[in-house]
Amino acid sequence: MNPELPPNHLDKPVDDAYDHTLGPADAEITLVEYGSYADAPSRSAHERVAELRSRFGNRMRYVFRHRPLAGSKIARRAAELVESHNNSGRFWDLHVALMSRSDKLSADDLCTIISDLKLEGNKEAGQEETAERARDRVEADIASANASGVIVTPTFFINGRRYDGPWDVRSLSEAMLGSLGHVVHAAALDFAKWAPSTGIMLLLATALAVVLSNSALGPDFNEMWEQRLGITFQHSAFELSLRHWINDGLLVIFFLVVGLEIKREFTVGHLAERQSAMLPIAAAIGGMAVPALLYLILVPPGPPMAPGSDGTDGAWSYGWGVPMATDTAFAIALIAMMGKRVPVELRVFLTAAAIVDDIGAIIVVAIFYSGELHIAYLGSAVAIAGLLALLNKGGVYRASPYVILGIVLWVFVYASGIHATLAGIILALFIPTRPPPNLRALMLQADAILTAETRRGREVMHYGPSEPALEALDAIHDRLESPAARMLRHLAPRSSFLVLPVFALANAGVVVETSVFGEHIPLMLGTATALVIGKPLGFITATVTAVRLGFATKPDAYSWRQLGGAGALAGIGFTMSLFIASQAFPEVSDYAAAKIAIFGGSILSAIIGVAILWNAQAEEEKNP
């Protein structure tokens, strides 16, 4: 597969001299189908394609490529049969004959079609060579299908982009005509599926925040985040600044996604097996402990927290949690942009380590960066968590009860003095999982429902499926994935493309002034050094120790140098570091200095990490 192409694009461009095409080469619409002759959906789609060709005429070019059903000998024989008669100009005759069979394709059908088309005597010289050429052509189409992300047959590509919508003529026509809704949806999907997209969104939001903060609009921009919003009821009011609503409210979605990802990794993911989990766990622990210790060594206590303090418990002492964090989105985005220069196994390792890192950051925030505890509200939060546990234990799979209780939980957690975003983690623990369904049984059930509906004739054509049928199909759809998996699938892109960019926009703005430096130089140097040096040092030290002691094994797919490069990328603290800094430094000047240090340390870590990984691969290619 071409690594430069998005995963939902045609890997192999259409070639009229090679491909089987119907329609002019300069047609504005090219519809490519990967299909199988032994597949009822492909035969049904053949009729839809005929309607589309009739509707669009010379505006459309149709291309057929083989993707025989896996494990079906008759499907493979049919595809090779068609290809073996390609040179005699009978491809489309055979194609239409095979696609027009209404019953399940059999060997007798092939004999009948050959007889009907009078192909018995059409035996080219060198039968073995013809058969081999046909096999090679089918194999080439299968390879192209796999590289283009084809999973089912038929799969359509419209002007090079995979079409994932319904197979009815109206839906296909709208996609082919490029309606505004379809174009916007397709562009959004392309961007979202591009691996570096989340990092780019964060980078743009950060750059915008910094530019606006240092422009003539800076005072208004910063004042906007301090606008107070809330609910007033009679003489009572609950108000927070817009920035606090984002940091304490909107960011709950991010922590909910993190919690669901942690849950997945420890149940069916890379952390489910001890042997594969130990290396990233060791790396994450080292990558948290060493930067924190380095910060405490390098950074002085700073000014006292309050008048009358003896200075030993200074304001800067609480910032040791800042360099512990890793921004997974940025780190993975950089690895993805380097393509094949970075082994897939290293990306898996860094992702797993970042998950463990998130657990550590959550624990640190809960214990060290929460306010004064209010026992009554904390007890209420525990009671709500108990209700969530009862729902989980009782097999309640609807999302709405969990969402409602999750909102109530957030209120009590916020009021208790514990950081409110931890409500997202607690909620994630109780969102239920389920064993995988019996797909064959669900498919038969859905087929039975739809077959019964089609017997209603004109009524179903005018009004669609009946309400009982829709409810039954909804139940089948709900069973396809667990509530936890469904919630993660829906919330993860919203967290990446909405929550985190908004958080960066609200928190990354810093006015760069010479006054920020001055007495804050030790704080800034210590924070940046802990990120740039502490992270890779902790990664390497902990992983080498774990491997030497026999607790973990390092895959051969990547070298120690590449692991060090991943450790350097883990020094990109950014969003989580900004979040912890916002809790650790209540003073505006301290927070501004910490933000500059986080930016500088993260940028330097990114440059060092990319350089190490780039040169490590070049060195391996030079000395295989």
Curated annotation (Swiss-Prot):
Spans annotated as Unknown: 1-164
Membrane-spanning parts: 199-219, 240-260, 279-299, 319-339, 348-368, 371-391, 407-427, 497-517, 521-541, 565-585, 596-616
Reactions that this protein is recorded to catalyse: Na(+)(in) + 2 H(+)(out) = Na(+)(out) + 2 H(+)(in)
Membrane topology: Multi-pass membrane protein
Compartment annotation: Cell inner membrane
Entry keyword Transcription: no
GO BP: regulation of pH
InterPro entries: Na/H_antiporter_dom_sf, NhaA, Thioredoxin-like_fold, Thioredoxin-like_sf
Region entry Na(+)/H(+) antiporter NhaA, spans: 165-624
Major subcellular site: membrane
An annotated Gene Ontology molecular function: sodium:proton antiporter activity
Keywords: Antiport, Cell inner membrane, Cell membrane, Ion transport, Membrane, Sodium, Sodium transport, Transmembrane, Transmembrane helix, Transport
GO CC annotation terms, alphabetical: plasma membrane
Function: Na(+)/H(+) antiporter that extrudes sodium in exchange for external protons.
HAMAP family: NhaA (MF_01844)
PANTHER family the UniProt entry points to: NA(+)_H(+) ANTIPORTER NHAA, SODIUM ION/PROTON ANTIPORTER NHAA-RELATED
Family as reported in the entry's similarity comment: Belongs to the NhaA Na(+)/H(+) (TC 2.A.33) antiporter family.
Protein name: Na(+)/H(+) antiporter NhaA
Biological source species: Nitrosospira multiformis (strain ATCC 25196 / NCIMB 11849 / C 71)
Phylogenetic classification of the source organism: Bacteria, Pseudomonadati, Pseudomonadota, Betaproteobacteria, Nitrosomonadales
Gene: nhaA
